[in-house]
Amino acid sequence: MAKVKAVLLDFDGTLVHRDILDVVCGIVGKEAESERINREFHDGKHAGLSALITRINFLKGVTQSQIDAKLQQEAFLMPGARELMAYVNERGIITILNSGNIRPVLLAYQKMLGITHIVGSEPTMHGGTIAGITEAQFTGPNFKLDGIKLILEQAGTQPHETIAIGDSPADRPAFEFAGTSIAINPKGGVEAFADYVIHDLSEAIPIIDQKL
């Protein structure tokens, strides 16, 4: 059995129980509008990356420090998140947080939880201020998995040495890539592609433990 060397962790619905892009859009009074666009995307009214790009561009002029301050008020962490991160960090297991959310948001959680690597949307930044994003700044619809593969390649870690944790059909590419897959509070039938189903992130600890 391959030793687990990396955990691939989805963000919204997995590490956190709120859509954090909606939350930070509240900094500029656009939380409700972001929520509406996101609902329309899930209803099939927006194709490709257009909805995500629109929501990110609400944040033009917002700073990293504003985002950090907003998330320090409330982090919206899923039950068991801190326990899981403490467990993997103590054992030197690489963690890769992957999301369509923006790098400034993921950086806040990286600092909060000691996450090793982050993969997310990369808006143009002027100093610590968000200047916007375009479709050209994404490698493609599978940009999250592309980023994961690059990090693992640099670390010399093979797919069968990884565990992916996610909650929705958007995580299926990571589930199919990783050696082991865990669905947390699954939606959209993604549990059919998972090896395990959990409802608290700390429940992933014994699964990882038996693979060390």
How would you label these PLM feature ranges?
Residues 2, 91-93, 151-160, 211-212:
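Glycine-rich phosphate-binding loop signature in dinucleotide/nucleotide-binding domains
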Residues 95, 99-100, 159-199:
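Acidic, Mg2+-coordinating phosphoryl-transfer loop and its flanking beta/alpha structural elements
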Residues 126-133, 191-198, 207-211:
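Short, charged, surface-exposed secondary-structure boundary motifs
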Residues 107-162:
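Substrate-recognition "cap/lid" segment bordering the active-site pocket of phosphatases
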Residues 82-90, 144-145, 149-156, 176:
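Surface-exposed amphipathic alpha-helices with a cationic face
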Residues 68-103, 107:
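Short, acidic loop-to-helix structural element flanking the phosphoryl-transfer center
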Residues 1-54:
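Active-site neighborhood of HAD-like aspartate-dependent phosphohydrolases
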Residues 120-126, 186-190, 202-204:
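Short, acidic/turn-prone active-site loops that include or flank metal/cofactor-
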